[in-house]
């Protein structure tokens, strides 16, 4: 899994699936691209990627358990610019897939389950004696 570093472009997000540089997905219409270029000059590049059916941006601090969900609440309300500025002002440097978060959740569930099984085994063995 490759992380998205500062200064590197991700795919174009909310409100269409075109990309800033035509490599990822189809290129944006020129008018939109021009507007975007002007906006980027004001607030810096937008390097946010969305994944999954609910299109959550996961911002990562370096620890897999620190994934932060910024859900897309309706079209255009949470823009790439908003997510970028939030990430920038919170000093988060990477954006990753939600896979990291789900794996950590599964790990927690597994450890809890195993501890429970161990407890049951000890209880049964004590009861048999």
From Swiss-Prot:
Q: Which is one Gene Ontology cellular component term of this protein?
A: membrane
Q: What is this protein called?
A: Protein FYV12
Q: Which UniProt keywords apply?
A: Glycoprotein, Membrane, Transmembrane, Transmembrane helix
Which positions, given as ranges, span the membrane?
A: 109-128
Q: What does this protein do?
A: Involved in K1 killer toxin resistance.
Q: What is its main location?
A: membrane
Compartments (UniProt record)? Membrane
Residues bearing carbohydrate: 91
Give the top-rank taxon of the lineage listed in the UniProt record for this protein.
Eukaryota
| Bilayer topology annotation | Single-pass membrane protein
